[in-house]
Amino acid sequence: LIKGNIVVIPAGGRTLFLEDTGTAPMLKATGEIPEWSGKEFPATFGQSADDDGNVYVQWHRRDNAGRVDIMRFEGDTLKTGDFVPGTDTNIRMDGLLSFSPVAIRGKEVFRVKPETDRGLIQHNISTKEIKALSGAGAIAPPVLTKRHVIFGGLDGTLRIIDLNSKSQRETKMARGAISAPVAIANGRIFASSEDGTLYLLGIPSDLEMPMQRLNASALRSPLSGKLANAKYDWYTNYGNFAGQNANHQDLKPPLRMRWARRLEGTVKHLPVCGGGRIYTHTAEGQIIACEQDTGRLLWRKWFPDVYLSFTSPLYINGKLLVPQAGMKKSFVRCLDATTGNLLWEAPFTGSPSWSRQFPPVVAGKVAIYASGSGDYAPQGSEKPYTFGGEPVVPKDGSEVMSFIYSNDNPYYPKNHHPRLWAWDLDTGKVVWEKDFFEFGRGGNDCGICILDGKLYYSVFFGYDAETKRRRGLPVENNGLTCCIDPQSGKILWQTNEYYVTSKCTLSARDGKLYIGGYNKAKAGTEDRHVWCLDANTGKLVWTSDAVTSALNVVSVGEKFMFSNALRGKGNVFDSATGKVIYSIQTNYACCRFTMSEPYVLGANMDMIDLSQEGKLVSTGPAIDSRECLGAVVSNGRIFYTSQASGFVVSQTYGPESKNLPPAWQVR
């Protein structure tokens, strides 16, 4: 961004103001976003400036937290801390983040978001008035003319809004999303689409719409090498249907950057790979496929009414299954992985909240998913139903859960039922359903996996038996775990003694089932444990040493067994006894580590060698200010998606890192 002789650039979570002195740049000031919804340096998703020299910064810190801050010079002093009213978002507020620079005219600020009914918003800085001018979700920055504001949507439609009458004209131009700002010259509008075509709109026009379109979704650089085979795909959030979160692909230093690309969304799932593509699902409803080898965008789809759905895609046999949750409606959607075209969708209920990233699991031709039911709002009606802040009780006094709720749930609302759905993979028709409400209330804090042709399901009901009794809820059980025939839904065994305790799914290997979690399993104790059950009988094999917590999943490799703790130690277990062999003082937040033996991979490509008692052998580049996501190894490459900073990157390793240069050097 250039304003006069001042160059404004984002760098490392700051905003740098460089003065062009004619012979050299001189740092004039460094702008920092003040503490709000966190302290870490945020990512900049867009910068703009007005005629008075004010700089507008759309930033994101974590988990939907961000806003458009205004920086300005008063004399030689840079003033920060002001922001455009109505642009602030976080997990407790109603509204999604924006990922684009704003357009400014006087005191009016125009801003797009990938959010239904709030696609283009007009903010008045003086009156604080907010007007929704278009409901179509968008990430392409709006462009102002004398009488209109123009933007392209994620649906491939160009929209022109009259600033006086607020009337809107729509032109469906593209098969792909329009993600870049339009250009305007000589009364004509030029719009580039992700379908690979440049479109022109205007009168007169002597150009015709293209009859033969580019096949932009086709692979141009397929994977090659000894690990390109599908059996080496990291095809679901936890690596495979057993939830093992581990593989062995001869990972070793040194690492080398292969490619990097921007991501206009927030995520909490790990990269998913299959068919030569890497797939990403943003919490705002975008599903994106890129070429694994180069990072080139292949296709992007956006579905309305998705709201903070931190869920993972699943790749299986040319199909992509993605749970997309929202407060208005939720669907598991099945897409053609090659084109992104929708094949079928099936409704479900509930909120994935922070930590239920898992997509469906598949047994034969049956796709199975677990969730809850009940009522949700941006903020819950009781403290246990919230993630901080003051509860908001509906006028009718009903119980409402925050859509992004606490990780510490002693009990759940009365109308929350634990649910399981099974659909035909080819048609989306229901094969069977289960509701476990007779055993307890809850459903969203759960886990599923498949081992040896059997489905395993575990759910948490809360640990506060006394409060559940007073509220008229079932008190006998704090949770349950069961083994199910995935074809019929028949229960093969069930126990109420051992169960996940939120923020963790199930994992299984060699006839054993592994259960972790974040919460206490029952009132009166602060200890947490990992349980190991016999997968054939449900009987306890061992209880681990006490741990701070066991988040996300217990990673179970051929040799090593590992779990992370929230702001605590990561632990390496003896898989035969549950004894902690040694601990790693990672002090990460809720990092979703993965294992590619003998290493575990953390945030910012941290590579920790478990065969050397947790030695850090490689790290970086540090592209993310948060610690929520680790990297994965798939098909002989490393893939990493930043939770906060809007990047997806890939690295090569070992001998390949010497021979395969970054993609941008060989184009």
Predicted regions and their residues:
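Repeat-blade elements of multi-bladed beta-propeller folds
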Residues: 1-15, 40-69, 92-119, 134-158, ...
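Short, solvent-exposed loop/turn and secondary-structure capping segments
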Residues: 20-21, 202, 246, 292, ...
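A short beta-strand motif characteristic of beta-propeller blades
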Residues: 26-38, 79-92, 127-134, 167-172, ...
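Non-catalytic propeptide/linker segments at domain boundaries
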Residues: 209-224, 230
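Blade/loop signatures of beta-propeller domains
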Residues: 222-258
